[in-house]
Amino acid sequence: YMDANGINKTIYLVAFAYYSYRQPPVKLVNGEYVAVDESVIPKKDGKVRVGVMYTPIEACYTHPISDEVETCDKNAQIAEEMKAWASITDYLMMYSYGTNFQAYKYHFNNWSHIGDSIRFYEKCGLKYYFEQACAQNDISPMSSMRAYVRSKLAWNSAYNTQDLIDEFIEHYYGDGAESVKQYFGAVMENFERIYTIDGTEDHNIYYSKITNNESWTRSLVKELQSYLEKADYKIDIGSSNRKDVYKERVFREYFLLKDCEYMKYSGYLNQEEYDELERLVMYGREKYNAYLSTEKTNNG
């Protein structure tokens, strides 16, 4: 049909390897993965070819997906499945996740491992990487930094993730950068405390306990707010001619903390304080279309 109609392009049909379709149709022969038979090998030539979009929704997003560094048993199995798929397809793709669907307005900590994971994907010959984030609100914590770090690693997996984080903050927040670094560092330290409290580091994309009050105490929320208030102040007294831009970027993070305070700890406030907080939160929710705390599905 394509030849008859002068269509000169290559079309890729993509198989979605998701849930029960995640397992690759392979067997081990002398320690190597091979297809169980020729019929399961995705078509690699011609104008219509077949790729595989591997989608490990069950993964732990605290640890790397890799066979080269220490990881959890769940992700070690996922790494083996990726290698198995890579053995039978030339067009391996990845559908990953960058948010907790039960906690849209909370930090999602897959920062420490993302470099190791992307280096492993590169070793597997990955052709395409997609990461689903919080699309139902217009913002989520450090979402711009998340996009920056991942795009840089996609171009060059040898980059150090912490160096990219520092580079982003220094350029994105201007005179407020050092205080934002303190804020982000305190968030990461809190995750270590959360892992100790929960007795596990296995946090998936539906880990609802991350939102409880024990994970984000009132004193911690106020401490995090203070770092961003300091960042805003330093921008005000700085010499940049882009103060409004930097202040807006800080406010996005600040609003999310205020939203957390409003939902969890507004009972500590007197009426005047409560009214002021509510005005800020309602303004932020409208400005950023940030009304949802959890995923809204077609079923409600």
Predicted regions and their residues:
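Detector for methionine-enriched segments
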Residues: 2, 53, 82, 93-94, ...
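Repeat-unit-sized solenoid/scaffold elements
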Residues: 30-64, 93, 97, 117-136, ...
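Surface-exposed beta-strand edges and their flanking turn/coil or helix-capping segments
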Residues: 28-30, 65-68, 107-109, 144, ...
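A structural motif corresponding to the C-terminal end of an alpha-helix
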Residues: 1-11, 84-92, 121-126, 227-237
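Catalytic domains of carbohydrate-active enzymes that cleave complex glycans
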Residues: 125, 152-300
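Gly/Pro-rich turn-and-neighbor structural signature
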Residues: 1-86, 96
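Structured mid-domain segments that build the active-site/substrate or prosthetic-cofactor binding neighborhood
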Residues: 70-178, 182
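Weak global preference for isoleucine
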Residues: 7, 11, 41, 57, ...
